[in-house]
C-alpha cells in the first residue's frame, strides 16, 4: 500500500543503553505525538498502517520494536500466535516500559500512547 506520509525506521536509545529500532511517520503540521505499541506479532503492516493513519490526522508517530531486546526485525504472520506469545513471555514488562519510554522521550511533550493486542496491555501499564 502506498501512503502520502513519509515513513522511516529510526534508532532509539533506552535509558539502560539498549538501542532499538522504531517505525516513524511524521505529520506535515503536527498537533501532537503518539507512541503506537505493537501486537505480539511485531511491527506488522497493520501497525505501520495505523501509524500512517494517525500521521495523516496530524500526529507524529513512533512504533518502537520492543522485541529488539532479543532479536531485531521480528515480524510474524498472524498465524504464528504461539511464536508471538513466546516472544511476549520472554520480554519483561520493565524492559518494554523502558523502550516505550525511549519513544516517548524522543517525541517529547503532548505524547499519547496506544496499543493493540499485547500493546494494549502495555499501554495500560505505561499509563499507571
Q: Which residues are covered by each model-predicted region?
A:
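N-terminal cap/leader regions of alpha/beta-hydrolase-fold enzymes
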Residues: 1-128
Amino acid at each position: 500500500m502506498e501512503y502520502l506520509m513519509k515513513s522511516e525506521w529510526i534508532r532509539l536509545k533506552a535509558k539502560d543503553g539498549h538501542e532499538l529500532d522504531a517505525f516513524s511517520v511524521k505529520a506535515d503540521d503536527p498537533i501532537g505525538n503518539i507512541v503506537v505499541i505493537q501486537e505480539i506479532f511485531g511491527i506488522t503492516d497493520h501497525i505501520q498502517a495505523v501509524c500512517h493513519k494517525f500521521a495523516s490526522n496530524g500526529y507524529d508517530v513512533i512504533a518502537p520494536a520492543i522485541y529488539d531486546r532479543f532479536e531485531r526485525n521480528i515480524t510474524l504472520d498472524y498465524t504464528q500466535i504461539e511464536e508471538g506469545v513466546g516472544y511476549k513471555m520472554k520480554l519483561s514488562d520493565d524492559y518494554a516500559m523502558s523502550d516505550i519510554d525511549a519513544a516517548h522521550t524522543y517525541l517529547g511533550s503532548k505524547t499519547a500512547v496506544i496499543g493493540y493486542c499485547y500493546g494494549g496491555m502495555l499501554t495500560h501499564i505505561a499509563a499507571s
